[in-house]
Amino acid sequence: MRPVEQGNRERFLDTALTVLFDRGVSALTVRGVAEAAGASTISVYARFGGRAGLLDALYERTFDSLRELLEGLPPASPDGVADLLHLALEYRLFARESPVRYALMFERPVPGFDPDPALRSAVVRTTFTLFIARVQRVCPPEADARETAYQLWTAMHGLVGAELMLASRTPLPDWFIPPTEEANERMYRRGVTAMMTGLGLRNN
């Protein structure tokens, strides 16, 4: 792909991400992205082949953002447990930064869109490999680091998913978790810490 074409492709993806953030998944159409970018629908079709191609590329871009977050974490310290908890907290902030982006990554909010299986496998493998590396440092020798990482991730995903779900609805007047950032962060931290302890993760 020529540099100009690559630049235009990236511009459309940047625009699509902005549309996703500002207007939600319903606005992720070829026409909607083209109008937001000040371009023709033909130019979007020429680079992505249609809405499915655009959504596949955007799906890949969202995982690129998560990969960049994981790669940008501070270097490993002697306290691998603290490092892993820090990763988990950053993951929560990533999800909260844009619930619609997070939904595009892990749910199916766009009717009729299911990411290409090969693409889905590639992006998940890349990001999960970075996560496994952090878990490996504190994983018991007898445990499988991949399985342990998956179990920890499901806890992280479940906790933040429940938080996002509750945040999108009218607060329950008698719910035991106050609808505050401090309370939600504390609940998430405690849940992740309990899971890490249960998995036997420790500094070796």
Kindly give the residue locations of the regions a language model identified:
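Amphipathic C-terminal alpha-helical segment
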Residues: A133, W153-W175, A194-N203
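Helix-turn-helix
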Residues: R11, V19-G53, A57
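N-terminal intrinsically disordered/low-complexity leader segments
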Residues: M1-G7, T18, S77, P171, ...
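Amphipathic alpha-helical packing segments from all-alpha helical-bundle domains
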Residues: L70, D114-C139, R146-Y150, E182-M196
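Alpha-helical DNA-contacting segments of helix-turn-helix folds
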Residues: L20, L55-T62, M105, R120, ...
